[in-house]
Swiss-Prot record:
One of its GO terms (cellular component) is cytosol. It comes from Gloeothece citriformis (strain PCC 7424) (Cyanothece sp. (strain PCC 7424)). The gene is nusB. Belongs to the NusB family. The keyword Transcription applies. This is Transcription antitermination protein NusB.
Length: 212
């Protein structure tokens, strides 16, 4: 992605990572500076890095205990191997978050900063102001799933995409593609595939409603 050509994608990432930390009335949000959005995003990523590393350390410790308990039982060895694999995945996740922490300030500096700030704040304001409608739309298409049971990052990606499609006049295909690309960066394979499926059901429902 060329930062100069993709200010809206950078804005989406900042909005996604800032949603839990940037709150207040529309008037207060209008006063938020771009640097505050960047700091909020980095704090979110930092928290995720710490959580991933702590969980990874716990998995390694548990795997060592299994190995010490019995070096010959196949079930213990297999269990320990699984724990180590999970710890490695968590560590890789932390590394990816650290990379994003380094990249975000640079991307913002190289982009149209005014456009990034304005669109990030527009997304945040819309998600908060239209929260009930957005969540009702998602609940309608999420058969056998509850929004609040999803990982927070996945919930917020869905909220932003629906806000863009319904209230910010972003073409549905663009909103879905952008959501999936961001999910590939901040979620896992299962997460981005699930997000893609949910958003496609949203577009189908919107098209059906439009024909009535």
């Amino acid at each position: 992605m060329s930062p100069r050509q993709q200010p809206r994608r950078i804005a989406r990432e900042l909005a996604l990572l800032s949603l839990s930390q940037i709150k207040g009335s529309s008037d207060k949000l209008e006063q938020v500076e771009l640097n505050n959005l960047v700091i909020a995003a980095i704090r979110t990523l930092s928290g995720e890095v710490q959580e991933s590393l702590e969980t990874a350390a716990a998995e390694v410790s548990r795997s060592q205990e299994r190995l010490l308990a019995s070096e010959t039982r196949a079930t213990n060895l297999k269990s320990a191997q699984t724990m180590v694999t999970e710890a490695l995945e968590l560590t890789q996740n932390a590394i990816n978050r650290l990379a994003a922490m380094v990249e975000i300030p640079e991307m913002v500096q190289l982009s149209s900063q005014y456009e990034v700030r304005e669109y990030a704040l527009e997304i945040i304001q819309t998600v908060y102001r239209r929260q009930t409608e957005i969540e009702q739309e998602l609940a309608t298409v999420m058969v056998d799933w509850q929004l609040n049971r999803l990982p927070k990052i996945d919930r917020d990606i869905l909220r932003i995409a629906v806000a863009e499609m319904i209230f910010l006049e972003v073409p549905q295909k663009v909103a879905i593609n952008e959501a999936v690309e961001i999910a590939k960066r901040y979620s896992d394979e299962e997460g981005y595939r699930f997000i893609n499926g949910v958003l496609r059901r949203v577009t189908e429902r919107l098209k059906t409603e439009a024909r009535r």
